[in-house]
Amino acid sequence: MVTIRADEISKIIRERIEEYNREVKIVNTGTVLQVGDGIARIHGLDEVMAGELVEFQEGTVGIALNLESTNVGVVLMGDGLLIQEGSSVKATGRIAQIPVSEAYLGRVVNALAKPIDGRGEISASEYRLIESPAPGIISRRSVYEPLQTGLIAIDSMIPIGRGQRELIIGDRQTGKTAVATDTILNQQGQNVICVYVAIGQKASSVAQVVTNFQERGAMEYTIVVAETADSPATLQYLAPYTGAALAEFFMYRKRHTLIIYDDPSKQAQAYRQMSLLLRRPPGREAYPGDVFYLHSRLLERAAKLGSLLGEGSMTALPIVETQSGDVSAYIPTNVISITDGQIFLSADLFNAGIRPAINVGISVSRVGSAAQIKAMKQVAGKLKLELAQFAELEAFAQFASDLDKATQNQLARGQRLRELLKQSQSAPLAVEEQIMTIYTGTNGYLDSLEIGQVRKFLVELRTYLKTNKPQFQEIISSTKIFTEEAEALLKEAIQEQMERFILQEQV
């Protein structure tokens, strides 16, 4: 007969009672009233906060944007095809956040930081809010370090500094994305983390950019955030903030970052679509009233941090497309007023074969020479002045039939200077090569050459200087000054190469 031991039974019962945890969980729920066009109207959810994430019964997540007296307007982060009228919705008590880590380098992700390159999951132990506040005034310091783009026209006359926001603006097909991608390619070996955000682009265009980065080894230090044209409006609206959150992760770890937004006008269109479907009152060009805040809170996150926060930086290059050169439209004027300058690309210059098609006359950097090394300041001042005078003379020369010799010489010099600013795509130049190119042009060494020979001569001169006068590059990179010794080496190289070049051309 089995003996029942009362003490054992009572011990087991006590243990079970101790383990019992009666947790009462209050969940804020609601019911779907209607759903469609990426928008859901919810009844209930009384305690929900603006911007809070809500979860639908079938797993779709949305963001509560409109808090009205009778219902809540939610934008869906997905197609929401399985959401039914009358199904339940619960508030999560969280706002949108993404995982962040070093493992994101070299990957292509969507607006929720989920990989879309088919290379498996990305490990991350830390999270950042998609919309985190920008650094305050005390946390920042003024921009003083150059961020080299590798493009002579920009680095000499419209310099960009680390922590600056510089707008790239122009009509479609004027090479705006090419300027941005060349800047990323030029960061190789500069210890700069790059983030390229593609908003509402064609999938083929994004694939082309990624392939370009992979072929040139730029994906090692680059993250691509992509939401293509067929993505829901909510995800196109979130993509730039996701890119900024990934860049901030590195910025607050004392690193330098560069973020390209391509382009914020598509984000504004997605936000306009969401706002109109939520029945928010339309304003100018049917955009909602807070479209300025949409971009200002994004671009203000770019900063040069002070010494207390580790001196990291985030440089932002937003790209905005204009319609037939109209920079006075709503979104272009908004972004111009937020940024620290703009690089204007002209369709006329592009079609005339001047590429990159940068209109130097109306482009501006509000940081200026603070974002240049001393050597560049020494040679670039003369270039900008001579090009400005040339532009003025060229307009005048169209009406004048007989020009004096001095004017003819000035026009000839200007044409050669314009020629030296031309560069092939995906061929950024080191700052030493740029200084050498500008010096050669502004000091009249190219005046004796035909316009068609200028680029060929400069390419050969760069090669000659690298192989025969490596000290020149060493002096500039170590001292950052265009010393007398460097100038003597350069003059010598130009004269030697000019003799060789003339002999070659005669043969």
Swiss-Prot record:
Record-marked site positions (Required for activity): 363
Annotated residues for binding of ATP: 170-177
Pfam families per UniProt: ATP-synt_ab, ATP-synt_ab_C, ATP-synt_ab_N
Location, primary (coarse class): plastid
Class of the enzyme per the UniProt entry, highest EC level: translocase
PROSITE patterns linked: ATPASE_ALPHA_BETA
Keyword Cell membrane in annotation: no
InterPro entries from the UniProt entry: ATP_synth_asu-like_sf (IPR023366), ATP_synth_asu_C (IPR000793), ATP_synth_asu_C_sf (IPR038376), ATP_synth_F1_a_nt-bd_dom (IPR033732), ATP_synth_F1_asu (IPR005294), ATPase_a/bsu_AS (IPR020003), ATPase_F1/V1/A1_a/bsu_N (IPR004100), ATPase_F1/V1/A1_a/bsu_N_sf (IPR036121)
Its EC number(s): 7.1.2.2
Reactions that this protein is recorded to catalyse: ATP + H2O + 4 H(+)(in) = ADP + phosphate + 5 H(+)(out)
Localisation: Plastid, Chloroplast thylakoid membrane
Membrane topology, record value: Peripheral membrane protein
NCBIfam families: atpA (TIGR00962), PRK13343.1 (NF009884)
Known function: Produces ATP from ADP in the presence of a proton gradient across the membrane. The alpha chain is a regulatory subunit.
HAMAP family: ATP_synth_alpha_bact
Cited PANTHER family: ATP SYNTHASE SUBUNIT ALPHA, MITOCHONDRIAL
Protein known as: ATP synthase subunit alpha, chloroplastic
Organism: Daucus carota
